């Protein structure tokens, strides 16, 4: 690299010269110019080309093409018959202007360390440092926090990270930090936070991530399929492990069944979803429910089933407990209000006759309820999840092929028959080696908190909250370390996040893209993408179709390092390197994982080749013998020998355990609770009349691939994230298709590009989650997001005292045509690289490929 010696600036030297900092002439042009603008220059005639490199991703397996060391194209793996359109954006994941190239430290933190001016976080001004200096600072901060405060001051978190059984950021972060000292852990997640807490109390398992009844059995036996807030066709594009996308063959078969009239599909959703549209807008019955009123509709369906004697009393008597305690509420004996169809009509906007007809259809033949996750991401989301089970129990078809309920149909290829195969191990975050700082003194604070309430811990340390039957005293967090996650994407109410961020002394982010979490961090470490390393992955999730080699496509870019190497070097600083690596390098770990899989296979009658043969010759192996499965079948066939994991062993329509918690917002049986804000005549709707959805996107996985210009060109409107709005609402506001609009409420404001569509019910708008935050004034609590991150607008409250999960679905806004100044979107650039004049030359002023 040119000027290599001049690039290493000691902290002391930097501080001495900081007074001479200037910005003009110091912005690294290669950090601020989109890489795609220079892509043509990178591929010269006669360039060395390598094609067909096999690897995997959250979006599917691909064959990569590399030209002169640059990842230029991704083609679908030949075994994937239904590839995702998103693989077109994978080269951009490696080569883009938002790529983190070097270790960086926020300017004022470099000047003052943990006593820096935290209001400057988000101004995007950083100085480049060497890896040694960055890791020294990381280690010194861990030491300082443990010695000064103890484990109650440190929180670490990870998220969707990248695919690969070995290179998982969450396991590596967890092990490295655990070898140094204890810290605050988190429970729950943002995807299914309410459902995963209530459902174990009701049916004994989380349900949300588990295999569903095999699609061939559903297609053979179901007469009615109810899609309740579930968009399978859109969401199955990306999975946790590398998807095989085999589930799409069953969607094709379902479409044929719907067209022929063999299966009736009902979609309960304010929006015509991608699944609804795929199956046929005129073929699917649409129940365009008012947002957040699903529980009144469920109660009215239950009331109709009971009052018209359409329910299965035998199933309730033999497989459930608590229906008798629930019934007085349903009939209005407690509050004088029967929860009938006429009552529900006023709330959910569905005609009472339609509600009654729906109940009759569901009871008339085999009905499969397919429940999504978005609905439970509202205030009191536990109640909807609970009522899904109650309705299925009243129908009496739980455990029958093509009947009952399921919460995971849109995820991980659910319903694809699973194969008799091997599940590879990986790099575990656990360790038996004691930490350097072995204190377990949390000073009376809780060592585990609900993840969706971690901002409460920062803003209100010492506050006591209830959580799933426990009392939690929120710890006084001083330092956070994030790897493979983006809290500014997944947590609600960004201006509240910024307020909390100012109270933290140190934030460290390890990532491969300059997300807003990195822009608001103090120390930023560049990690590789999955395309710059070797790994192994499952091919197919619930299908367990096979194992795939993830071959390195290109070399690590700039100074990016594998998470494994980052944390290994960190652990070396406190004499725990051997405990972290266990004496193995990357290929050593892959061989161990393979050998453990071979041992597992022997017990199942499966023979794997030796690792070298698989890696160098085969690259992919496929398992045989798909097996049919019926969810809850064993319980139905013998509830005594196969009880559920509830206190009674049965489905708990009434839960004494929950009742004994005495929560006013989650009681002993499912109920309707009014929301803190709700559209269509609900609280707050006169001021903020539009409900804002922030569901999973069409062209990315959460915030991953938002950096892809290739994909943004397919969906962005005027360079902004689209906001979808009904024609009636648009016309009333003078908004036309393609207009730039301001979406706002009391919590914040964003710009977005209007897409006027009759797929959205009046009073309903949508901005997909994962849009990158792009404030016009970085770090300002009143900033305007120039790109369109919906979490500027969402509300940061817990679902209830039971789950304390996210309530992102409880959000009202107003929308107006934007007429103000139109600043350029800068979210997809790198940082403002600050340097000491005449002493420090940014590498970006040289050849970026040196």
UniProtKB/Swiss-Prot annotation:
UniProt KW keywords: Metal-binding, Molybdenum, Oxidoreductase, Periplasm, Signal
UniProt key word Metal-binding: yes
GO terms of molecular function: electron transfer activity; molybdenum ion binding; molybdopterin cofactor binding; trimethylamine-N-oxide reductase (cytochrome c) activity
Modifications made to the protein after synthesis: Predicted to be exported by the Tat system. The position of the signal peptide cleavage has not been experimentally proven.
GO cellular component: outer membrane-bounded periplasmic space
Gene3D superfamilies named among the record's database cross-references: 2.40.40.20, 3.40.50.740, Dimethylsulfoxide Reductase, domain 2, Dimethylsulfoxide Reductase, domain 3
Cofactor requirements of the protein: Mo-bis(molybdopterin guanine dinucleotide)
Main location, first listed in the record: periplasm
Catalytic activity: trimethylamine + 2 Fe(III)-[cytochrome c] + H2O = trimethylamine N-oxide + 2 Fe(II)-[cytochrome c] + 3 H(+)
EC top class named in words: oxidoreductase
Record's cofactor remark: Binds 1 molybdenum-bis(molybdopterin guanine dinucleotide) (Mo-bis-MGD) cofactor per subunit.
EC number(s) given by UniProt: 1.7.2.3
Protein family: Belongs to the prokaryotic molybdopterin-containing oxidoreductase family.
PANTHER family, per database record: TRIMETHYLAMINE-N-OXIDE REDUCTASE, TRIMETHYLAMINE-N-OXIDE REDUCTASE 1
Protein name, entry field: Trimethylamine-N-oxide reductase
Taxonomic lineage from the root: Bacteria, Pseudomonadati, Pseudomonadota, Gammaproteobacteria, Enterobacterales
